[in-house]
A protein has these predicted regions:
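Conserved catalytic-core segment of NTP-binding enzymes
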Residues: 4-102
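C-terminal lobe/tail of nucleotide-utilizing enzymes
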Residues: 61-159
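P-loop/Walker-type NTP enzyme "switch/lid" segment
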Residues: 1-8, 114-116
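Generic hydrophobic alpha-helical segments
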Residues: 2-3, 17, 137, 141
């Protein structure tokens, strides 16, 4: 109900949940139009993703939420130099080819520093690999404002 009251005032409302299948997650799904979930490169995340997809479908059926769509998943806390990330990416591409975003979020110590200070990434370090990756993810989702996307492209020499 709270989100319905403000929904028209925003282009996007992001709801970030703890990795749990609980009351808060259920309410977040019910309040959403689209669901995006991060996964790590470990086996637990693969199993958890399947559980999330099952729960989303159950909640949609129970509460008649046909409008809710699972938009996709992206890998986070990635060390691109490991063979595990390559194997896991191939696994996801094989099993959920239309649901895996190409952009992944690199493991970055600046994220832990930011979290320990309760400071948003944009205020902590503009040189964060994770911040750069999240911006790329938003560009891939086509939800990053044009002026921000243009600045990002200029900063990496794509403009």
């Amino acid at each position: 109900k709270a989100i319905k009251a403000i929904k028209d005032e925003f282009d996007f409302i992001l709801i970030d949940n703890a990795p749990a299948l609980d009351f808060f997650t259920t309410n977040s799904i019910a309040a959403s139009d689209y669901i995006i979930t991060p996964v790590r490169e470990d086996g637990f995340s693969r199993k958890g993703l399947k559980e999330i997809l099952d729960v989303v479908n159950e909640i949609k059926d129970e509460h008649d939420l046909d409008h809710v769509k699972f938009l996709g998943t992206f890998m986070t806390q990635v060390n691109p130099r490991t063979t595990m990330v390559k194997e896991r990416t191939l696994d996801y591409q094989k099993n959920i080819p239309d649901l895996l975003f190409h952009t992944y979020i690199r493991n970055d110590t600046k994220v832990a520093q930011m979290e320990s200070k309760f400071v948003p990434m944009l205020e902590h370090s503009l040189e964060s690999n994770a911040l750069f990756d999240y911006c790329h993810l938003l560009m891939e989702m086509e939800i990053l404002p044009d002026q921000v996307a243009q600045k990002l492209r200029c900063s990496i020499g794509e403009a």
